[in-house]
Amino acid sequence: MASKRKSTTPCMIPVKTMVLPGASTEAQPVEPLPEGPQQDLPSEAPEASSEAAPNPSSTDGSALANGHRGTLDGYVYSCKECDFRSQDVTHFVGHMTSEHTDFNKDPHFVCTGCSFLAKTPEGLSLHNAKCHSGEASFLWNVTKPDNHVVVEQSVPENASSSVLAGESTEGTEIIITKTPIMKIMKGKAEAKKIHMLKENAPTQPGGEALPKPLAGETEGKEGDHTFINGATPVSQASANSTKPPHTANGPLIGTVPVLPAGIAQFLSLQQPTVHPQHHPHQPLPTSKALPKVMIPLSSIPTYNAAMDSNSFLKNSFHKFPYPTKAELCYLTVVTKYPEEQLKIWFTAQRLKQGISWSPEEIEDARKKMFNTVIQSVPQPTITVLNTPLVASAGNVQHLIQAALPGHAVGQPEGTAGGLLVTQPLMANGLQASSSSLPLTTASVPKPTAAPINTVCSNTTSAVKVVNAAQSLLTACPSITSQAFLDANIYKNKKSHEQLSALKGSFCRNQFPGQSEVEHLTKVTGLSTREVRKWFSDRRYHCRNLKGTRAMVPGEHGSVLIDSVPEVPFPLSSKVPEVPCVPTATSLVSHPATKRQSWHQTPDFTPTKYKERAPEQLRVLESSFAQNPLPPEEELDRLRSETKMTRREIDGWFSERRKRVNAEETKKADGHAPQEEAEGAEEEGRDEELASELRAPGENGSSEMFLSHTLAERKVSPIKINLKNLRVTEASGKSELPGMGMGVCEPEEDGLNKAVEQPPSRVSYKKTAQQRHLLRQLFVQTQWPSNQDYDSIMAQTGLPRPEVVRWFGDSRYALKNGQLKWYEDYKRGNFPPGLLVIAPGNRELLQDYYMTHKMLCEEDLQTLCEKTQMSAQQVKQWFAEKMGEETRAVADTSSEDQGPGHGEPVAVDKVLGDACAALSENSEAWEPSAPEAGSEPFDTSSPQSGRQLETD
C-alpha cells in the first residue's frame, strides 16, 4: 500500500470510490487491467460512439470518468443518424436545415421531462429558463418517431445529481465552469474547441460507460483543477484517463493507452511527443486557471440562463468583457434581448470569471487590444503638403492617432524623404479601410533646410503643418515631440513660427478681420484674445518707433526703403498696392515664397502684390465708373471676369476711391501738397499737432471740429477731407492698411504721409475730459464688454474702433509699467478740472461756496454725506472753484488792485491745502509718454494763479 501511495499521482481518486450506488446496469465491473485497452477503441469505432451518444446517462457518466464533467454543462446538440454533435445552436439549426429538409416544414422541439412542445429553439430555451432554471446541462437528440423528425430534449441525471450533491441549495448557484472562455480576438474557434472536448470523450465502446465519480469529489476536483473553459488541466485529465490505480506500480511509459481525440489535442500542446495521433479539429492554447466564483441566482433576479448559449453574446464577451454602447445596441438587434438584460448578463459573466477592472484599466486594455484598429471618425481630413513625396514603405507614418482631434503628426528619426501618405494605409501590419481615413497630399517645391514646428488645432480634426523660416507647409524627417507647439506651455512666449505667421499677417493688415483672426488661431494655436492682443501691442510699438524703415513686398522679394515722409509714393500700376507697415523687425528680406503659406486654408485668400493686367484694369475701371461702391452681384461678376480674389477687388476699389478724393482735394486747394509736406516735417512735435487738431469747444469732438469754416481751421483741407472719407468708409477687411495706423495718444502719424498714401483710419485727438472718462472705465475693467463700449462711446463721442484701440494701448502700457496715471485713478485722485459732479450736487456746493467763499474743515463731513462724494473730491472741487475766481480776478483787476479784493490769503491757504497731494504727484497727471507733450491740461494750477496775482 505504501508503494502504491507513493507512485499514485496526487489528486487521483481510486476507481473503487468512483462507483455510485445507482450506476447504470450497463456499466461493466471495474477491472484493473482491461480498462486501459478499452479506451483505445473510440477512435476506431465511431459507430459505437455515435450509438452511445443519445444516452444521456451513459454519456454523462463517461464524461465524468474522463475528468471532463464541465464540458457537459450547457446545451449539447446531437444527431445520431448523421453522426453530428455540437454545442452551438446555430450550427445545430444549420445542420437540421441542410440535412433534414422535412424537419423545416413542421419542426418539433419536445422536452421529454415536461412533455412540452415548441416550434422553435428559442421557445424551448424560454421553457428551460422558466421550468428548468436550476438545470445547466441539456441534451438535444434527433429522433424519428413515426418517420417524423423530432428534436427531443433530456436532462442528464448525473449532471443534475452532482450539482445537487455538491451544493447546499438546489439550483441556486452557477459555477465558473459553466461560463465561456474569455479569449480576446479568438471568438470563432470556441465552438471547435468545445465540440472537440465533447465529441468523443463521453462514450466508451459498445455504449458502455465508465463508472461515475462521486458528486462531492467531482466538485472538489473542479474547484482545484478547472480551466475557465470548463476542461480539467492536461496533467489531471491525462492522469485520470491513462493511469488506473492498479497500474501504479508498473512503468508509465509502457502502459500509456491511446487517449480520446479531444484530450489528445490538449495533451499535445504540453507533451507533443506522448501521443502522435492527429485530429482534424484545430487545437487552441489553454488559458490560465481562474478561481471558482459561486454566484447565487437569487442575486440576479432577471438573469436568463438561455442567454448562455447565444453565440453572439459569447463571441462578444470573448472579445472584450466590457461592451461599449454601440456593441450593446448591435447585440440588442441580433439577439432580440433588451439592453438591460444584456448588461445583467455581461455583469454576471464578469462576476463568474472574476473580472473586475477599474475604468482606467478598461480604457488601457481597450487601447492595447485595438491599437491596430482604426476607429471610425466622422470624415476627418489630414492635409499634408510634403516635399518631396517618396514612394518608400520605410517612410510610412503611423497616422492612426492623427485622425483624432488634438493629436499631432510626427515622423520617426532616421528616415529620409519626408512624409509619405498612401492608400490603403498600413498600420502595425494591418491593412485599414481607405474610406475611414481620407488623406489629402500635395507637393510643393523643396525649400532650404530649416527647423520647423508642427501645430495641430484642437478644434478641428485637420492636421496642419507650418514651416518656420520659409512659412511653407513641409514635412521634415527630424520632427520630434519637443517641436510641437503647446500654447499652455509657452504661455506669453511665442515661438518663431507663431511670430512669423503673426508678422506676415501684420504686414498685410494691421487691423485683421474676423476671418483673418480665425485663420491665425488655427495656424498658430493661440486664442483669439492672444492674437488680438498681439496686434494691439504691435501697433502701439510701431507707432512709437521713429525713423524705422518700411518693407515694401515686391514680386520677387522685399524692397527696403527709408521712411521719408516728404517723398510721396508715386501711384502707378507697377507699385505694390499696399506697402507694409514699418516695424522694427521688418529689416530682413523674406523670399516671395512666403505667400504660399496662406494657401493651406481654402477659405483664406491672400492679397497678391503684383501688377494688374491691362484687361483686368479695363474691367475694374469700367465697373468703377458705373459705381464706386459695387454691390455683391457686381463683385461676384468681377471675380469671375478678372480672376481676382474678393479682397483684391475690395482693395482696388478702396484705393481707387481714395485716389479720386485726393484728386478732388488737390483741385480745391492747390497749396495742399506744400502744407502737407510742412506738416510731415513736423513729425514728433506732438504739442503743435495737438494745437492744430484741438477743437475750439470744451468737448473737442470731431463733429464740432468739422463744423467750423475753412478759414477758422489750422489744418489743411486735405486732412479734413481724409477724415471725412475715413469716417464714412467701413473699416472692415475691405480696407487695406496704410502706414499711419497709430495706437498711442499722438495719433497724427498718418498726417505725415503724402496725398497718394492716405491713412487707413481716422485719428482722433481726445480732450482731457474724454481721456478722463476712458481712464475711469479702464480702472473699473481692462476688458470692457459691449455694453461698456456703448456707454463710453455715448459719453465721449468717440467711435468704437478708437475706443477699442485706446484700451488696447492702455493695456500694453500698463503691462510695461508706462501707465503713470493708473495708480492715482485707482485711488480716486483725478486731475483738476475733470471732476464729474451731478447737477444737484453742483448746486449744493455752489450755494455753500457763495455763502462761505471757502471750505471749512468742520463742514467737510456734512458736504460729503449730502453730495455722496469723497472728501478728496469735495476738496478738489473747492480748489478748482477758487482757482477759477483767482484767475478771473487776475485778468480783470487793475495793477493797483490790492489783496483786499476778496480774501486771497485765505484762498491761497485753502488752495495749498487742497492741492498738496496733487502737487506732489504733478507728474502723475501727465498722460503716458505719448500724451505728455501733446495734450496738456487746460486748467491752470493754483500756483500759476498766485503767480498772476503777484504780477
UniProtKB/Swiss-Prot annotation:
The keyword Magnesium does not apply. Its main location: cytoplasm. Residues 297-495 are annotated as: Required for repressor activity. Residues 490-548 are annotated as: Required for nuclear localization. InterPro entries: HD (IPR001356), Homeodomain-like_sf (IPR009057), Homez_homeobox_dom (IPR024578), ZHX_Znf_C2H2 (IPR041057), Znf_C2H2_sf (IPR036236), Znf_C2H2_type (IPR013087). It holds the Pfam family Homez. Residues 675-690 have a biased composition (Acidic residues). Residues 661-674 have a biased composition (Basic and acidic residues). SUPFAM superfamilies: beta-beta-alpha zinc fingers (SSF57667), Homeodomain-like (SSF46689). GO terms for biological process: cell differentiation; negative regulation of DNA-templated transcription; negative regulation of transcription by RNA polymerase II; positive regulation of osteoblast differentiation; regulation of transcription by RNA polymerase II. One of its GO terms (molecular function) is protein homodimerization activity. Residues 298-357, 487-546, 605-664, 759-818, 830-889 bind DNA. The modification Phosphoserine is found at residues 597, 701, 716, 922, 941. A zinc finger (C2H2-type) spans 77-100, 109-132. Residues 1-66, 198-249, 621-642, 661-702, 885-951 are annotated as: Disordered. Residues 237-481 are annotated as: Required for homodimerization and interaction with NFYA. Keywords: Cytoplasm, Differentiation, DNA-binding, Homeobox, Metal-binding, Nucleus, Phosphoprotein, Repeat, Repressor, Transcription, Transcription regulation, Zinc, Zinc-finger. Widely expressed. One of its GO terms (cellular component) is cytoplasm. Residues 232-244, 937-951 have a biased composition (Polar residues). Residues 42-58 have a biased composition (Low complexity). It is found in: Cytoplasm; Nucleus. Homodimer (via homeobox domain 1). Heterodimer with ZHX1 (via homeobox domain 1). Heterodimer with ZHX2 (via homeobox domain 1). Heterodimerization with ZHX1 is a prerequisite for repressor activity. Interacts with NFYA. Acts as a transcriptional repressor. Involved in the early stages of mesenchymal stem cell (MSC) osteogenic differentiation. Is a regulator of podocyte gene expression during primary glomerula disease. Binds to promoter DNA. Belongs to the ZHX family. This is Zinc fingers and homeoboxes protein 3. The lineage of its organism: Eukaryota, Metazoa, Chordata, Craniata, Vertebrata.
